[in-house]
Amino acid sequence: TLGGNYVKRDGILKGEMISFAGLCKMACCNLAESFENSASVTVGYSDAISGARQIKMLGLAGTYTQILDENRPIMRGLSAPYGLSYTPGMWLNSIQVSKGISSVTAGHEAITGQINLEHRKPTDDERLFINFYLDDELRPELNLSTALPVTKDKKLSTILLLHGSLDTHLLGDMDDNGDGFMDLPKTRLGAVANRWLYTADNG
């Protein structure tokens, strides 16, 4: 859809879908920033020193929300508050959000809901995708993905995902309230992922 966010009603569970069009509206987004236009999920800072973010669903903290990577549980325990910032939004095809207690097929941690991430696939038709962002604080961010068939029959394909971002306060330390402490931490982030897919003759 043009809006990027819509409610799925064709499955067993009703849930919100954040499509790639919705993710493109937030060019600087990591996973934590991907929910800015979502009415189902609230994101805030849980630690101002490290910049860790925490999600809230149905008024409860993110520890009660199960986060899935293509229906596989991820971000358990201590990785939950920091993993949101380490997943670039431009690596995702879509995000599915379902509120309330759901199926235990993918795990039992979902009390307030589930968030499922669908990444870009090696079989994507878009062979090259480049995204560059620069905000008013001179924070740059670069995302690149390239999906290629390795063999002529396309049985073997791969995708390379690259991400880099800098938040070094080039215009000076951010201290809008004048308390002597930076409002945001300085960060440098680089991430690389390489996925392969082999399709056998028998499927």
Regions found by a protein language model. Give the residues of each.
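Short strand-turn segments of transmembrane beta-barrel domains in outer membranes
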Residues: S94-V104, Q114, E118-P149, M182-P185
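Outer-membrane beta-barrel proteins
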Residues: L78, R139-E141, D167-D173
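Transmembrane beta-barrel architecture of outer-membrane proteins
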Residues: M26, N30, A52, Y82, ...
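Short acidic/polar hinge/loop motifs at secondary-structure boundaries
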Residues: Q54-K56, R72-K99
